[in-house]
Structures are given as structure tokens and as C-alpha cells.
Amino acid sequence: MSKLYFTEDHEWVSVDDDGIGTIGITDYAQKQLGDVVFVELPEIGREIERGGDAAVVESVKAASEVYSPVSGEVVEANDSLPEAPGQVNTDALGDGWFFKVRLSEPAELDELMDQEAYDAFVGELD
């Protein structure tokens, strides 16, 4: 499995050997949201900036922006999410991914947290 990187806004990115990052929200985030009922995904070909609005997730509790942890071009969106948004709750780090990006600035990964740092960050929130 590729290494996971995390943001303080509870997004994750996993980058493959071809420089494609798969992006989603963390298990912590989905638990805070509650049952996800709607997901709006970015368009293929869209250029997104690190920290910029990329997608929307709505739950029974709230609507929330999903920010991109990296800059690049959207190359794929998880087409199954609009029909089955609950995948975000059941498999946030797997089938519940939101979109994939061809990284334009791979060095941005160095500014993100690894699993250990993210776990410590979340531990301070509870």
C-alpha cells in the first residue's frame, strides 16, 4: 500500500509510483460528520490548488468542503460515491475515496503529516 499523508483538515492522500494521488477524508472526519448522504465531486481536467475547495460532502449533521491536500489536475473521480455516499462512512480510506490528482508539486507532500503525526494530532482533539 502507498504511504498515506494527512492534513489538519482531515483529508488524506496516497500517491502511487506514477505521481497520481488518491484523495479522501479520514475516518475521524467521517465519524464527526455522521451518515454521509451526498457527495459532489470535482470535474475531470480541473486544476486544483493545495488547500483549495475540491469537493463537497454532506451528512445528516452538516455540509463540508473537502480541500485538496496537493496541487494538480483531477484525472479521475469516484463515480460510485454519488450513488452510494455511505462508502465514505464504511471505508473512508478505501472505497470511500473522492478523486485522483496528477500532482504538479510533489514537494507539497513534505508539508503533510504521516500516519503517526496525524494520530497524535487527532489524539489532541479528543
UniProtKB/Swiss-Prot annotation:
Report whether Transmembrane helix shows up as a keyword of the record: no
Keywords linked to the UniProt accession: Lipoyl
Kindly indicate whether the keyword Hydrolase belongs to this entry.
no
Instruction: Report the cofactor remark.
Output: Binds 1 lipoyl cofactor covalently.
Q: Which cofactor does it need?
A: (R)-lipoate
Q: Mind telling me which Gene3D superfamilies this protein's record contains?
A: 2.40.50.100
> PANTHER family, from UniProt?
GLYCINE CLEAVAGE SYSTEM H PROTEIN, GLYCINE CLEAVAGE SYSTEM H PROTEIN-RELATED
Q: What is this protein called?
A: Glycine cleavage system H protein
